[in-house]
Amino acid sequence: HIPKSTISSDGSKMMKSLANNLKKKIFSQDSAIMELTRVIKANKAGLSESNKPIGSFVFAGPSGVGKTELSKELAKLLGIAFIKFDMSEYMEPHSISRLIGAPAGYVGFEQGGLLVDAVRKSPYCVLLLDEIEKAHSDIYNILLQILDSASLTDNLGNRADFKNVIIIMTSNAGSKDSNTLGFNAALQHKND
């Protein structure tokens, strides 16, 4: 659930104006903003599943449309931590193990998983998995566990609880094929 500080009288006013405050900072993303705020308000009202993260979202589109910025502003307005993982750093199968810790006998075994440690340190957070399509497909096994049970355990037995986490994944996949607006559209038709 959302932290108690956000539920105070000032926090209630902030929750009512969350969508408008986000729209002041992020332009042309009204549907994403409305869906985010709807899910957060439902969670605050106790209308969401208690064994799942607050919400999980995929923001897809070309670079520069505000996917990452919306995530940052959301965390800022809610007064919670913003944790970002650049998924291009997890393209190899062995690199995925850094998120949950290396298996016994491998370098880094004595360290916990980066993702588990980050969420344990900041249990109320917006977790951004940036450019999710670049990560090795093994990431989806980890995500399935997080989205299904809102928990993840690293190689040392440390358990992170994702019940108070808003998970946002961004993707540029398919954005080159999408319709373009303005001058780019005119240039594209001219070149065809």
Q: Could you describe each region identified by the protein language model?
A:
Residues H1-D192:
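AAA+ P-loop NTPase nucleotide-binding core of proteostasis motors
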